[in-house]
Amino acid sequence: MSDAKISRIAVLGLGNVGELAATLLQGSGFSVTGVDIAPPNHAVPFAVASASAASKKELTKVLKDQQAVLSCLPYHLNEAVARLACELDLHYFDLTEDVATKEVIIELARRSGKLMAPQCGLAPGFVGIVGAHLAEQFSTIRSIKLRVGALPQHPTGLLAYSFN
């Protein structure tokens, strides 16, 4: 794996989460290209490209000059994006919580010379960061349990809510 610092990153999917991620990355010194099939019609602080996540040809054109890709797309699109990132020798990050997709990406990581990091979203991603920060506040810790609320695909119970 190269020690070259990542400076160019594409953020796929410019919904609320993707646009925020792209804005924060740009503000942190990265050169960001936001990619969406329907780019925002308002000003954003990063370059924008139009491409369909379903089109390998369109994505390849946008990603070929990048060093990394952050997928903020629906989970069912991430496997194809991760495979393309591996082909193009790009670092890969996503926000998915889908176990099957994560397993495919872990297998791709074994062949890739780049970082392939699924599940960088709320849980386990952000929750792990919060847990580590909280742990630093104590001299010793026996255990940490963090719970994340989720909207299940098949809601049950009075609240139609679940804890992961």
Regions found by a protein language model. Give the residues of each.
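Rossmann-fold NAD(P)-binding glycine/threonine-rich loop
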Residues: 95-118
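NAD(P)-binding Rossmann-fold cofactor-contacting core
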Residues: 29-44
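Glycine-rich Rossmann-fold phosphate-binding loop(s) that bind the pyrophosphate
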Residues: 14-15
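Rossmann-like dinucleotide-binding core of oxidoreductases
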Residues: 114-164
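Beta-loop-alpha module in the N-terminal Rossmann-like domain of NAD(P)-dependent dehydrogenases
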Residues: 68-85, 98-100
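Conserved Rossmann-fold cofactor-binding substructure of NAD(P)-dependent oxidoreductases
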Residues: 53-65
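N-terminal Rossmann-fold NAD(P) dinucleotide-binding loop
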Residues: 18-19
